[in-house]
Structures are given as C-alpha cells and as structure tokens.
C-alpha cells in the first residue's frame, strides 16, 4: 500500500530543509549536493565555509564569530542504502508527509537533525554575540561507512589549527519514543578482533594423529566469553564480548580441521582504552593457547561527558533546560547504543551531547518520524543556541 501525501499550506522551515536534503540520494560516502545546499544557507547567515574532499569523502567546516566559547554542531549527510525498494510505501528519496509523519531515507538518521539545527540557527543567530561565541558546523558524508575520513579527519584538522572545542552537540537520533526523552552523554567503545588457531589436519577416524583446531578454539572462546568483565553502572553499560564468526575454510565431514579463524567484537566501557583492552584480551587468549595469533581492527574509543561546575559552559545543563522548556520534562541521560562520531570530538575539555529525534525506525524500510518530533527538536536547538549568549 502506497503512502498518500498530505497537503500542508505553510510547512515549518525545518520540514522544508529536511525535504530538500532527503531528496538527495546521499548513500555513504556520497554527499549528493547536501553540503553545497548547507553551505549556501550558512554563508547567507555569515558563516565562513570550507569544503574538503578526502579520499572521496565530503567534509564541510563552517565558522561564525570569534569568541572564546567554542560551540560546534556535528552531523552527517550520508545515509545507509534503502534496501529492497519494493518494500517501501513510497520512494525512499522522495520524502512524503502523510498522517503527520515524514517518510524517507534520512528522516530519522539524521537529515532532520541537520534541518532542525539549520532552522534553529536562522532563528537564533541574530541573538548571538560574535565576541563571546565561535559557532562551528562540522558536517561529513562518512559516518555510516568506515568513518576514517569524516569527523575523525575534521577533528584532526581543527586540532592542527589549535582549535579547542568547549561543547559539541551531535544531531544523532538519541530519543526513544519522543524527542527530548533521552540524550546521550557517552558511548561504549568498540574493538573487533581476529584470532587464528592452528591445529593439525587428519582423518576423523584417527584423532590421535591430528590436532583439532576447533577444539582448541572452543577453549579460547570459552575463556573469552566467561571472563568477568565489569558489569557497568547506572550511567554506563558494562563491557561485553560477542563471537561474531568462526571459519575453518573448506569443509568435509571426515577431516579434522587444521586451522580456525575466530572473529569477535567487544563493546567496552570508558574504564578501558584500546591499548589496555587489547593487552587484556591477548593475556586471556595466550593463557589458553600460546600459539594463537590475534589482531585487532576498527577501534572506536569510549567516552563519557560529565557535567561542568561552570553552568554557562555546561552543555549538559543547557540541553536539559532546553528540553524541559520545550517538552515540560527532563530527559533520561544515557550512554546506550552503538558508536557515534561524538567519540572523535570528546575529550576532557570538550563536552559532547547527542540530542535528536526518536531512533525507532533508523536504517529500516519506511524510515519515518512524527512531524511534532522535528518541530520540537527545532525548538530545543534554538533554546540551546540562545543560551550561549546569556
């Protein structure tokens, strides 16, 4: 059944911006002109914009003002592939409003977040003091993919120019049911690994002449999955390890395998870093099989932003107040979920908070959000920006 579009006489500016961006088929790492549109709109507001193309990835860095308080908005214009088109009720790159819902790829993740901030910037920019605030837009087309040349590169670029962000608001879809019900102040880290276990091939009828690599591997798997990682706390999930794949190569049922490759992923708390976790995993593996080889890939560091004593420089406080004003309730402060680009900007000196629309349909067929969630997010973002000059 197809979606029947609704007719709206005067759509809100955030909805208009969302429809413009969602109509661009920006499947990662393609930007499809999204950043050109943003650059056009931001330059009209007085931003100085730079565009960089790094290994096929488009990055936009926009700067307004020159004050000592550095506030940044981080977002991504790329989206995941739409999947089977026949399962969509409307074309994924032809945004449709129906029954007060906005449908299309990027409706939740995260072109509406960018659109809400663009609308909020138009509303608030005249009230900001350029002598007090430096306002950054940091946008990439490489968040859904490898994330090697997007926000990671932008942060390194800013660091080389001695730019120290105080606050970074990430427009990822952080909410559960309604915009403002949940914000993210940290994320667990992620580390993937590959273990190679060697045995000796032989006939299954003569096990004494062979060494079964799977049997050896199972002991390693048992040690890893039963290791007592910390269970976490109320404000940060604990460390978990999952075996994601095992491979012996070609298979017949009368041969004892000579080698096994084990793939695993660890989601870890801020109590570890990549180096300390890798060393612990090596120790666990070598305690079972000294000859096993292990390598690591796709590291993502954990981070946790904590409240600042200085309320004027506390992004968490500003976000909570803005959400209370817009919704009448305070948000749940969470660190759940997968990795995000917030990890690239987080530091002891930079508070990172994710605030966005509900994430219930992200990466799904018929991705959508309620229009009320978009409009609420625009109000929240506007209030956050206005708080920078209070």
UniProtKB/Swiss-Prot annotation:
Active site per the UniProt annotation: 78, 143
Protein residues bound to Zn(2+) 1: 76, 109, 172
Record Gene3D superfamilies: 3.30.70.360, Zn peptidases (3.40.630.10)
UniProt xrefs under SUPFAM superfamilies: Bacterial exopeptidase dimerisation domain (SSF55031), Zn-dependent exopeptidases (SSF53187)
Record bears the keyword Zinc: yes
Positions bound to Zn(2+) 2: 109, 144, 363
EC number(s) stated in the UniProt entry for this protein: 3.5.1.18
GO-annotated molecular function: acetylornithine deacetylase activity; cobalt ion binding; succinyl-diaminopimelate desuccinylase activity; zinc ion binding
Quaternary structure (record): Homodimer.
Purpose: Catalyzes the hydrolysis of N-succinyl-L,L-diaminopimelic acid (SDAP), forming succinate and LL-2,6-diaminopimelate (DAP), an intermediate involved in the bacterial biosynthesis of lysine and meso-diaminopimelic acid, an essential component of bacterial cell walls.
PANTHER family: ACETYLORNITHINE DEACETYLASE (PTHR43808), N-ACETYL-L-CITRULLINE DEACETYLASE (PTHR43808:SF31)
Name this polypeptide is given: Succinyl-diaminopimelate desuccinylase 1
Native species: Alteromonas mediterranea (strain DSM 17117 / CIP 110805 / LMG 28347 / Deep ecotype)
């Amino acid at each position: 059944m197809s979606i029947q579009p609704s007719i709206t006489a005067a759509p809100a500016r955030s909805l208009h911006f969302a429809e413009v961006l969602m109509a661009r088929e920006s499947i990662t790492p393609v930007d499809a002109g999204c950043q050109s549109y943003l650059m056009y709109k931001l330059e009209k507001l007085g931003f100085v914009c730079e565009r960089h193309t790094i290994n096929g990835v488009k990055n936009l860095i926009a700067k307004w003002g020159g004050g000592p308080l550095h506030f940044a908005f981080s977002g991504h214009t790329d989206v995941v592939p739409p999947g089977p088109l026949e399962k969509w009720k409307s074309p994924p790159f032809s945004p449709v409003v129906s029954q007060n819902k906005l449908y299309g790829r990027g409706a939740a993740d995260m072109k509406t977040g960018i659109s809400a901030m663009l609308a909020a910037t138009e509303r608030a920019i005249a009230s900001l003091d350029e002598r007090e605030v430096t306002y950054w837009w940091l946008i990439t087309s490489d968040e859904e993919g490898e994330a090697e040349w997007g926000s990671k590169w932008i942060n390194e670029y800013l660091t080389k120019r001695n730019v120290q962000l105080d606050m970074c608001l990430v427009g990822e879809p952080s909410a559960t049911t309604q915009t403002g019900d949940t914000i993210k102040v940290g994320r667990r880290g992620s580390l993937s690994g590959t273990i190679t276990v060697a045995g000796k091939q032989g006939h299954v009828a003569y096990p004494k002449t062979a060494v079964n690599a799977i049997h050896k591997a199972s002991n390693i798997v048992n040690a890893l999955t039963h290791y007592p990682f910390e269970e976490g706390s109320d404000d940060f999930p604990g460390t978990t390890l999952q075996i994601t794949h095992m491979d012996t190569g070609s298979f017949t049922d009368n041969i004892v395998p000579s080698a096994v490759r084990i793939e695993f992923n660890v989601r870890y708390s801020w109590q570890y870093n990549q180096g300390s976790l890798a060393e612990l995993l090596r120790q666990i593996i070598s305690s079972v099989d000294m000859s096993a080889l292990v390598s690591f890939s796709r590291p993502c560091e954990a981070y946790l932003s904590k409240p600042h004593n200085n309320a004027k420089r506390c992004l968490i406080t500003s976000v909570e107040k803005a959400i209370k004003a817009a919704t009448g309730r305070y948000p749940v402060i969470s660190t759940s979920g997968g990795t995000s680009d917030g990890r690239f900007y987080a530091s002891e000196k930079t508070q990172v908070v994710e605030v966005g629309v509900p994430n219930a349909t992200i990466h799904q067929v018929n991705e959508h959000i309620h229009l009320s969630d978009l409009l609420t997010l625009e109000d929240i973002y506007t209030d956050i920006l206005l708080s920078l000059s209070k």
